[in-house]
């Protein structure tokens, strides 16, 4: 703090730049991370990047029944939802601490930020 209770702008700028670098690193880690979700006890598995992009889908031939396509569709959706949920957990773990710098406490010395 400078005299008069004003924040030191160079210190705030350095802190903001550090947070930006941490955010970029966390986003890169998320983009490279892959998680796998499953349904039907592993009969259908889906692989999703941390960004939410589906990059893989494996279906055990045992669940392919031409007379019961709906079950297979449900299993595929379930596996993708499971993987997406795991990707969101990774995002919360990686970005949560960084977002905490803006929410609630905000930037030190700057109310509302």
UniProtKB/Swiss-Prot annotation:
Keywords: Cytoplasm, DNA-binding. It is found in: Cytoplasm, Nucleoid. Pfam families: YbaB_DNA_bd (PF02575). GO terms for molecular function: DNA binding. One of its GO terms (cellular component) is bacterial nucleoid. PANTHER family: NUCLEOID-ASSOCIATED PROTEIN YBAB. This is Nucleoid-associated protein ROP_41370. It comes from Rhodococcus opacus (strain B4).
